[in-house]
Protein backbone atom coordinates (compact mmCIF):
# COMPACT_ATOMS: atom_id res chain seq x y z
CA UNK A 1 0.00 0.00 0.00
CA UNK A 2 1.08 3.58 -0.73
CA UNK A 3 0.06 6.38 1.64
CA UNK A 4 0.97 10.04 1.06
CA UNK A 5 -0.34 13.29 2.49
CA UNK A 6 -0.38 17.05 2.24
CA UNK A 7 0.11 18.84 5.54
CA UNK A 8 -2.16 21.89 5.45
CA UNK A 9 -0.26 23.76 8.12
CA UNK A 10 -0.54 27.20 9.72
CA UNK A 11 2.69 29.15 10.12
CA UNK A 12 3.64 31.61 12.84
CA UNK A 13 5.33 34.47 10.94
CA UNK A 14 9.09 34.21 11.25
CA UNK A 15 9.05 31.83 14.24
CA UNK A 16 10.93 28.78 13.04
CA UNK A 17 11.02 27.14 16.49
CA UNK A 18 7.24 27.33 16.88
CA UNK A 19 6.68 26.11 13.34
CA UNK A 20 9.03 23.16 13.83
CA UNK A 21 6.93 22.12 16.82
CA UNK A 22 3.67 22.33 14.89
CA UNK A 23 5.26 20.42 12.02
CA UNK A 24 6.35 17.70 14.44
CA UNK A 25 2.80 17.37 15.74
CA UNK A 26 1.56 16.87 12.20
CA UNK A 27 4.32 14.36 11.44
CA UNK A 28 3.39 12.27 14.47
CA UNK A 29 -0.29 12.43 13.57
CA UNK A 30 0.50 11.39 10.01
CA UNK A 31 2.58 8.47 11.29
CA UNK A 32 -0.45 7.18 13.18
CA UNK A 33 -2.26 6.99 9.84
CA UNK A 34 0.57 5.18 8.06
CA UNK A 35 1.71 8.12 5.93
CA UNK A 36 4.98 7.46 4.08
CA UNK A 37 5.45 10.91 2.50
CA UNK A 38 4.28 14.20 4.02
CA UNK A 39 4.51 17.44 2.01
CA UNK A 40 4.22 20.87 3.65
CA UNK A 41 3.37 24.20 1.96
CA UNK A 42 5.76 26.74 0.48
CA UNK A 43 7.87 28.41 3.20
CA UNK A 44 5.98 26.44 5.82
CA UNK A 45 8.67 26.85 8.48
CA UNK A 46 8.73 30.65 8.29
CA UNK A 47 5.48 31.68 6.70
CA UNK A 48 5.46 33.55 3.41
CA UNK A 49 7.33 36.58 4.77
CA UNK A 50 9.41 38.28 2.06
CA UNK A 51 10.90 40.92 4.35
CA UNK A 52 12.14 38.27 6.79
CA UNK A 53 13.51 35.72 4.32
CA UNK A 54 17.14 36.87 4.29
CA UNK A 55 17.39 36.45 8.06
CA UNK A 56 15.75 33.02 8.13
CA UNK A 57 17.96 31.03 5.73
CA UNK A 58 18.40 27.47 6.98
CA UNK A 59 20.63 24.57 5.99
CA UNK A 60 19.87 20.90 6.52
CA UNK A 61 22.37 20.66 9.38
CA UNK A 62 21.05 23.64 11.35
CA UNK A 63 20.17 22.53 14.86
CA UNK A 64 16.64 23.89 14.69
CA UNK A 65 15.82 21.37 11.94
CA UNK A 66 17.32 18.38 13.75
CA UNK A 67 13.99 17.33 15.32
CA UNK A 68 12.41 17.10 11.88
CA UNK A 69 15.27 15.03 10.48
CA UNK A 70 15.03 12.71 13.48
CA UNK A 71 11.25 12.47 13.10
CA UNK A 72 11.71 11.39 9.49
CA UNK A 73 14.10 8.66 10.60
CA UNK A 74 12.08 7.49 13.58
CA UNK A 75 8.75 7.34 11.74
CA UNK A 76 10.14 6.04 8.45
CA UNK A 77 8.41 8.94 6.69
CA UNK A 78 9.88 11.26 4.07
CA UNK A 79 9.21 14.95 4.78
CA UNK A 80 9.22 17.95 2.45
CA UNK A 81 9.32 21.30 4.29
CA UNK A 82 9.48 24.86 2.99
CA UNK A 83 12.13 27.36 4.08
CA UNK A 84 14.42 30.08 2.70
CA UNK A 85 17.76 28.57 1.71
CA UNK A 86 21.16 29.78 0.56
CA UNK A 87 21.37 30.92 -3.06
CA UNK A 88 23.41 29.07 -5.64
CA UNK A 89 25.75 32.04 -6.11
CA UNK A 90 27.34 33.88 -3.20
CA UNK A 91 25.87 37.33 -2.75
CA UNK A 92 22.55 36.51 -4.40
CA UNK A 93 19.22 36.74 -2.62
CA UNK A 94 18.09 33.58 -0.78
CA UNK A 95 16.23 30.93 -2.71
CA UNK A 96 12.80 29.57 -1.83
CA UNK A 97 13.64 26.03 -0.88
CA UNK A 98 12.09 22.67 -0.16
CA UNK A 99 14.20 20.53 2.14
CA UNK A 100 13.59 16.81 1.79
CA UNK A 101 14.34 14.75 4.88
CA UNK A 102 14.34 11.07 4.02
CA UNK A 103 13.43 8.11 6.16
CA UNK A 104 17.06 7.03 5.79
CA UNK A 105 18.35 10.24 7.38
CA UNK A 106 19.51 11.78 4.12
CA UNK A 107 18.69 15.38 3.19
CA UNK A 108 18.19 16.86 -0.28
CA UNK A 109 17.31 20.34 -1.49
CA UNK A 110 15.14 21.70 -4.28
CA UNK A 111 15.14 25.43 -5.04
CA UNK A 112 12.02 26.96 -6.58
CA UNK A 113 12.68 27.19 -10.31
CA UNK A 114 10.09 29.78 -11.37
CA UNK A 115 9.46 32.84 -9.22
CA UNK A 116 6.08 34.55 -8.97
CA UNK A 117 6.17 38.10 -10.34
CA UNK A 118 7.62 40.32 -7.63
CA UNK A 119 9.48 37.55 -5.80
CA UNK A 120 12.70 38.53 -7.53
CA UNK A 121 12.81 41.47 -5.10
CA UNK A 122 13.66 39.11 -2.23
CA UNK A 123 14.51 35.73 -3.75
CA UNK A 124 16.66 34.15 -6.44
CA UNK A 125 15.46 31.35 -8.68
CA UNK A 126 16.83 27.85 -8.78
CA UNK A 127 18.24 26.33 -11.95
CA UNK A 128 16.97 22.73 -11.86
CA UNK A 129 14.29 22.23 -14.48
CA UNK A 130 13.24 19.08 -12.65
CA UNK A 131 14.06 17.46 -9.31
CA UNK A 132 12.94 13.85 -8.99
CA UNK A 133 13.65 11.69 -5.96
CA UNK A 134 12.48 8.27 -4.84
CA UNK A 135 10.12 9.07 -1.95
CA UNK A 136 7.78 6.51 -0.39
CA UNK A 137 9.12 4.16 -3.05
CA UNK A 138 7.81 6.35 -5.89
CA UNK A 139 9.67 8.68 -8.28
CA UNK A 140 8.50 12.06 -7.00
CA UNK A 141 9.03 15.44 -8.66
CA UNK A 142 9.06 18.46 -6.37
CA UNK A 143 7.45 21.79 -7.21
CA UNK A 144 7.02 25.03 -5.28
CA UNK A 145 3.96 27.18 -5.98
CA UNK A 146 4.59 29.20 -9.17
CA UNK A 147 6.53 26.26 -10.64
CA UNK A 148 3.16 24.64 -11.23
CA UNK A 149 1.96 27.52 -13.42
CA UNK A 150 4.60 26.61 -16.00
CA UNK A 151 3.44 23.53 -17.96
CA UNK A 152 7.03 22.83 -19.01
CA UNK A 153 7.86 22.14 -15.36
CA UNK A 154 5.26 19.40 -15.09
CA UNK A 155 6.21 18.03 -18.51
CA UNK A 156 9.86 17.83 -17.43
CA UNK A 157 8.74 15.89 -14.36
CA UNK A 158 6.92 13.39 -16.53
CA UNK A 159 9.85 13.08 -18.92
CA UNK A 160 12.11 12.38 -15.93
CA UNK A 161 9.91 9.46 -14.94
CA UNK A 162 7.92 11.00 -12.10
CA UNK A 163 4.92 9.11 -10.77
CA UNK A 164 3.99 11.90 -8.33
CA UNK A 165 4.11 15.69 -8.79
CA UNK A 166 4.27 17.08 -5.25
CA UNK A 167 3.93 20.80 -4.69
CA UNK A 168 4.03 23.08 -1.68
CA UNK A 169 2.08 26.24 -2.37
CA UNK A 170 0.72 29.59 -1.24
CA UNK A 171 -2.61 29.82 -3.08
CA UNK A 172 -5.13 32.55 -2.31
CA UNK A 173 -8.89 32.36 -2.62
CA UNK A 174 -8.65 34.42 -5.80
CA UNK A 175 -6.09 32.13 -7.41
CA UNK A 176 -7.37 28.74 -6.30
CA UNK A 177 -9.79 28.02 -9.14
CA UNK A 178 -7.22 28.60 -11.87
CA UNK A 179 -4.38 26.84 -10.07
CA UNK A 180 -6.42 23.78 -9.11
CA UNK A 181 -7.72 23.37 -12.66
CA UNK A 182 -4.13 23.42 -13.90
CA UNK A 183 -3.04 20.81 -11.35
CA UNK A 184 -5.99 18.59 -12.22
CA UNK A 185 -4.99 18.99 -15.86
CA UNK A 186 -1.51 17.66 -15.19
CA UNK A 187 -3.03 14.55 -13.64
CA UNK A 188 -5.49 14.18 -16.52
CA UNK A 189 -3.22 14.99 -19.45
CA UNK A 190 0.15 13.72 -18.22
CA UNK A 191 -1.02 10.71 -16.22
CA UNK A 192 0.84 11.69 -13.06
CA UNK A 193 -0.62 11.79 -9.58
CA UNK A 194 -0.59 15.33 -8.15
CA UNK A 195 -0.40 16.32 -4.48
CA UNK A 196 -0.77 19.98 -3.43
CA UNK A 197 -0.18 21.33 0.09
CA UNK A 198 -1.52 24.84 0.74
CA UNK A 199 -1.39 27.00 3.84
CA UNK A 200 -4.39 26.72 6.13
CA UNK A 201 -4.49 30.39 7.17
CA UNK A 202 -3.38 33.80 5.90
CA UNK A 203 0.35 34.24 5.41
CA UNK A 204 2.37 37.15 4.12
CA UNK A 205 -0.74 39.13 3.30
CA UNK A 206 -2.34 36.34 1.28
CA UNK A 207 -5.73 34.99 2.35
CA UNK A 208 -4.84 31.39 1.59
CA UNK A 209 -7.64 29.14 0.45
CA UNK A 210 -6.57 25.93 2.15
CA UNK A 211 -8.24 23.14 0.17
CA UNK A 212 -5.05 21.10 -0.16
CA UNK A 213 -5.80 18.23 -2.51
CA UNK A 214 -4.75 15.10 -4.37
CA UNK A 215 -5.58 14.12 -7.94
CA UNK A 216 -5.05 10.58 -9.20
CA UNK A 217 -3.62 9.81 -12.64
CA UNK A 218 -6.43 10.56 -15.06
CA UNK A 219 -7.53 13.68 -13.20
CA UNK A 220 -10.02 12.43 -10.61
CA UNK A 221 -9.81 14.40 -7.37
CA UNK A 222 -9.51 11.77 -4.67
CA UNK A 223 -9.55 14.07 -1.66
CA UNK A 224 -9.41 17.75 -0.73
CA UNK A 225 -9.60 19.74 2.46
CA UNK A 226 -13.00 21.47 2.67
CA UNK A 227 -11.45 24.87 3.35
CA UNK A 228 -8.95 26.52 5.68
CA UNK A 229 -7.59 25.25 8.99
CA UNK A 230 -4.81 22.85 9.89
CA UNK A 231 -5.34 19.29 8.66
CA UNK A 232 -3.81 16.30 6.93
CA UNK A 233 -5.08 15.47 3.45
CA UNK A 234 -4.28 11.79 3.04
CA UNK A 235 -4.39 9.71 -0.14
CA UNK A 236 -3.75 5.98 -0.13
CA UNK A 237 -3.59 3.39 -2.88
CA UNK A 238 -4.18 -0.30 -2.38
CA UNK A 239 -4.66 -2.86 -5.13
CA UNK A 240 -4.68 -0.04 -7.67
CA UNK A 241 -7.56 1.86 -6.06
CA UNK A 242 -7.17 5.31 -4.49
CA UNK A 243 -8.97 6.44 -1.35
CA UNK A 244 -8.75 9.70 0.56
CA UNK A 245 -9.53 11.19 3.93
CA UNK A 246 -9.03 14.47 5.76
CA UNK A 247 -7.82 14.36 9.35
CA UNK A 248 -7.95 17.40 11.61
CA UNK A 249 -4.51 18.38 12.84
CA UNK A 250 -3.78 18.02 16.56
CA UNK A 251 -4.31 21.14 18.65
CA UNK A 252 -1.18 23.12 19.49
Please report, for each region that a protein language model flagged, where it lies by residue.
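Short, acidic/polar
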Residues: 18-29, 148-155
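Structural motif
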Residues: 36-37, 140, 163-164
Amino acid sequence: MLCIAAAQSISVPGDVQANVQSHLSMVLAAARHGVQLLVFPELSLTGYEPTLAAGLVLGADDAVLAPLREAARSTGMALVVGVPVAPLAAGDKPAIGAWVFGADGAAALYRKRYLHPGEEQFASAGVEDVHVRLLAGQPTALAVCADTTHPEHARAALDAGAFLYACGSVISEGGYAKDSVQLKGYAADLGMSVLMANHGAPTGGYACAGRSAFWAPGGAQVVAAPGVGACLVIASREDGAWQGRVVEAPAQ
